[in-house]
Amino acid sequence: MTAQSAQSDNQVLLTMTNVSKSFPGVKALDKANLTVKSHSVHALMGENGAGKSTLLKCLFGIYAKDEGEILFLGKPVNFKTSKEALENGISMVHQELNLVRQRNVMDNLWLGRYPLKGVFVDHTKMYNDTKAIFDELDIDIDPREKVANLSVSQMQMIEIAKAFSYNAKIVIMDEPTSSLSEKEVEHLFKIIEKLKDRGCGIVYISHKMDEIFKICDEITILRDGKWINTVPVKGSTMEQIVAMMVGRELTQRFPPKINEPKEVILEVEHLTALNQPSIQDINFELRKGEILGIAGLVGAKRTDIVETIFGVRERKSGTVKLHGKIMKNRTALEAINNGFALVTEERRSTGIYANLSIEFNSLISNMKSYMNKWGLLSDKKMKSDTQWVIDSMNVKTPSHKTTIGSLSGGNQQKVVIGRWLLTQPEILMLDEPTRGIDVGAKYEIYQLIMQLAQKDKGIIMISSEMPELLGITDRILVMSNGKVAGIVETAKTSQEEILQLAAKYL
């Protein structure tokens, strides 16, 4: 698929010029610019906190801009709500999908604008109109199916179809592939090409550089709220884009290997989860100071391994040994007390308490250690440990009382890792630790993982990003349909070998 195919009729659809927005103590946008053309995919890039979300919220009327001009189809606009923007032809497919799960697909597509036959909803027309849109976009979903029964990728297709139904001129996609398999990503890209062919302008927000270079035509880079540059994808390199994003040249994508695996610390033998389908007969060893990656396609049950070890998924059979001693880990609390820690995949839903402070989020897994014999909390020790998390994890924040939800994804993840380190684990399990994190913060997370391995922690890291696994691990365990398809040495393997193993039991 060529992303850079030239279109002779690239009409300018949207121009945002010198848009600024300030909040108390923070200038979130400082004369930011964005120009989107028809028949094109335009990447909006920048580290977390660069101003991407604020710029789009100014477009949708969620924030009132302080200054600047927005032109849509050549006319000045000042939308007061996202509904007004949508009705005028600007749609957004959010990372957190906005669907009513207990209603069916066509209800969601036409919510608030049902076709009527007299005073009654015309269900036949609604079905036929939905089917026509799905046929045009090659979406194979029954319009009468309940949304709750669909996969994340199918829900995403409905959001795109909804934008299509409004005859949107501009479709904004926020991290659209974060939960998709490789096959689903390819399908999404085909739909994006169809939208391009219809004359749409797509604004594509993603931290995945390979996707940007595959599907996009132009890239706008923001940094610290400022417009840095807009460049064509053709003729640009990943290194140039990263340098503009972070304000410095990132000579290496991954830090140098400084860890040295030693003796075996963890033995997992014949591990099978109780509720199937799940993991079956899992066997592997982990050495002190080793980073063991876990690879596999979506649905391979990679997460089930760490959940079963950690006690949040019930074990049917098998043993987990730490230093040769059997660990039952019947609950997460028992696992924590035995020296295990788990950084979960869904940071926002299961990793952080978004509306509470950095202090609370840093200490919650170890709260018992801050109580004296009368059950009172030691404020001094709590403040000291929170400051340790902030300093040692290099968390960028004005205060330990700052709400964690206001931090960038990278800083949130650092707090979560720091929280678990306060429990002094010997085994640290990380499930998709860099998902939704910008390229500069990713490098910091990699450095942190490497340093922990150097301090003799045993690290298990699940990742869907193949370059990440190949760049940071010592060995890779490949899962296929709940079983171990193979364990390979990272230095001697290839992406092709890993993908072949991942398909072994399909």
Swiss-Prot record:
InterPro entries: AAA+_ATPase, ABC_carbohydrate_import_ATPase, ABC_transporter-like_ATP-bd, ABC_transporter-like_CS, P-loop_NTPase
Assembly information from the UniProt record: The complex is composed of one ATP-binding protein (MglA), two transmembrane proteins (MglC) and a solute-binding protein (MglB).
Protein name: Galactose/methyl galactoside import ATP-binding protein MglA
SUPFAM superfamilies given in the database record: P-loop containing nucleoside triphosphate hydrolases
Function: Part of the ABC transporter complex MglABC involved in galactose/methyl galactoside import. Responsible for energy coupling to the transport system.
Keyword terms: ATP-binding, Cell inner membrane, Cell membrane, Membrane, Nucleotide-binding, Repeat, Sugar transport, Translocase, Transport
Translocase found in the keyword field: yes
Domain named ABC transporter: residues: 14-249, 264-506
Single GO cellular component term: plasma membrane
Superkingdom of this protein's organism: Bacteria
Binding site for ATP: G46, E47, N48, G49, A50, G51, K52, S53
Similarity comment text for this entry: Belongs to the ABC transporter superfamily. Galactose/methyl galactoside importer (TC 3.A.1.2.3) family.
Listed Gene3D superfamilies: P-loop containing nucleotide triphosphate hydrolases
Keyword ATP-binding: yes
UniProt EC number: 7.5.2.11
Catalytic reaction equation(s): D-galactose(out) + ATP + H2O = D-galactose(in) + ADP + phosphate + H(+); methyl beta-D-galactoside(out) + ATP + H2O = methyl beta-D-galactoside(in) + ADP + phosphate + H(+)
GO molecular function: ATP binding; ATP hydrolysis activity
